[in-house]
Amino acid sequence: MSYVYTSLLLLAEVCEPKMLPTFCTFALCAVPPLRSATASPIHTHYPHAFPDTAQWPLARVGKALEQQLPGEDLQAIISEISQANIEATIRKLASFGTRHTLSSQTDPERGIGAARTWLTAKFQEAADASEGRMTVDWNSFIKYPGDNERIIFPVNITTVVATLKGSEDPERLYVTGGHYDSRNSNPIDYQGDAPGAVDDASGVAVSLELARIFARYRPKASIAFTAFAGEEQGLLGAEHLAQTYKNNSANVAGMINLDMVGNSKAEDGTSDPNNIRLFCQGTPLTEDDTSAISRVSIGGENDSPARNLGRHIYEVASNAFTEMTVRLVYRLDRYSRGGDHRPFLEAGYTGVRFVQPNEDYTQQHQNVTVRAGKQYGDLVEWLDFEYNTRAAKVVASTMWSLANAPDIPRNVGSNVTTSDNFSQFKWEAPVGLPPEGYEIVYRETIEPHWTSVIEVGNVQWYNLTSATIHKDNVIFGVRSVGAGGYRSPAVLPFPFGCTRNC
């Protein structure tokens, strides 16, 4: 029985009779009379009409890609993460009553000023153990009323930044952190309670705990552990810090936002304790028109720097040591929400956001109150401190792996001068820490993660002479490899030598 004939019979079973002439017109064939509803099914063998293969492309070049497990140094860092410290930080931040950006900056016990003073002291404690390699600074500015309806009088907005200088590649910087300001139902209520336990004391607690631990280690690249302010008023602190870095031509190689990483339960009580979401933007917000057109023509919309950073984080942080799986979400952020990674993306940097797997909106941006017997508000009692600690392990794996690998290769390209079955790649070494070699990774275009890897050595070009792994059928990436097997995120090769449609 022909495929068209069989398909039309299948349609006849599930569609209204009046639709059949339309299908028949498209198929250019005649449709046999409809069988009765009691007739035996005709599609018993349908699943076998298109047998899938265990692997496609049919031949693999290189080897199957395996996730990167932590070495002894990273295992030691993970083992030092203290659930008690994370809980104590969250409880302390919630105890300030409100940390609204417009709240008191002078009251020693209540308001954002008291929280900032306490956080600065705690970051400084970490720095004191670093033998001078970590410094604590304030990134401050005055925000005036104007086009922002959530700023109703001039206010000092201060982000606390603890920067750990890299031992071998100090000019390359990775930024991580959460926001320490909070809010309730009214975005300009700066006097009512807003404990902000999950949103976002949970993220700040991770940043502070990792600063404490990392200060006694020597990552090769620099890491900034931050606590942002002004997030609830429009990502203001992160925007100012990102622009400060940009104005100083800082090499920010990645920004990892930690915003709401403390609760695994949804509003209906569903628990998802071993997954964490990672939101990864698609086409870069600052990409020029030529690059954007080329990206679309080669099907690279899903291989932005942010998404390849996300794939890298999945590889290094989803394992038995973290007890978590990183779940990539191909979006900038959740619907109608924003986060402090966005200003970094808008400044031309690569940024992603960690978020817990479920959300309870009765606990977010809510007044602390009881309505119809139900407790509302972002309270400490909602926290799952074990989950928050596992999230910290994920972030520790991320930051250590990134900071100890070489930077991504530069100017990665794929030669399309001629039409053939082979692929030729070229790239340039990254600035800073020299790689020990490079790898070409690839996957089928519909796969979310890299599946195969080719080790090419310490070269800056490679000819792939296998006709079975064709550039039309897979997505390629090139990544740097350093000492200890630490790898950079992969970079999508853009075509060169083409005359049309690329």
Curated annotation (Swiss-Prot):
Glycans are attached at residues 156, 247, 367, 415, 421, 463. Zn(2+) 2 binds at residues 199, 232. GO terms for biological process: proteolysis. Binds 2 Zn(2+) ions per subunit. Its cofactor is Zn(2+). Residues 408-502 form the Fibronectin type-III domain. Its EC number is 3.4.-.-. InterPro entries: FN3_dom, FN3_sf, M28_fam, Peptidase_M28. This is Probable zinc metalloprotease Lema_P049800. It comes from Leptosphaeria maculans (strain JN3 / isolate v23.1.3 / race Av1-4-5-6-7-8).
